Amino acid sequence: FKSGAKEVLAQAGAVPTFMAKYSDQMDGCSGHIHQSLWRDGESVFWDASAEHGMSDTMRSYVAGALVALPELFALFAPNVNSYKRYVSGSWAPTAATWAIENRTSSLRVIAPGPNGIRLEHRVPGADVNSYLGFAACLAGGLAGIERRLQPPPPTSGNVYAAEGLAPLPRTLDQAIELLDRSELARDYLGDAFVDHFVAMRRWEIEKHRRAVTEWERRRYFEQV
């Protein structure tokens, strides 16, 4: 999709951007991932007799996604710029939570019925590598199902105003350290992938540390 968009717009003399946060004057750009599981033409997420229509399988899937969220966060937010999107009040999540039809939560359950019930992962930005994002979603969900995990009660109301919630990683440095130590990531994605991805992102972090930004020039050129 990204390559196609760039090719089409190049013909019109334009360049699209998939940065998670292009401007500090605007909200960021998301890359939310909607997920549902089906067997023999029927959703295994749906149970008409259960609260919110969520089957036991879906509850375990959500629980796994929640547990995996901080450990796999770097796969959803792979760039230094990614973390500028997670700002309170911007419709981007800031805490590790799940909820029913709540756009301030990281994981949003949408349950209109048996054909539409799904989990919306609201963490990924527009800069996500969709293949890695899908893999991370499936890894967390599968871990939850295989381990028969159960989620905590869903968060309600404005998550931005809630207290005592587990924060999401604030920087790529934090996210990479969590990924590097994650047994879940290594079990489901493999040591070779994790080691390569971590090394690649640490190289990116070092490049960023050495860069002198326009903000620094405006801030300090005359003042210091």
Model-inferred region functions:
Residues 1-155, 159-165:
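Active-site capping/gating regions of soluble enzymes
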Residues 156-224:
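Acidic, glycine-enriched catalytic cores built around paired aspartates
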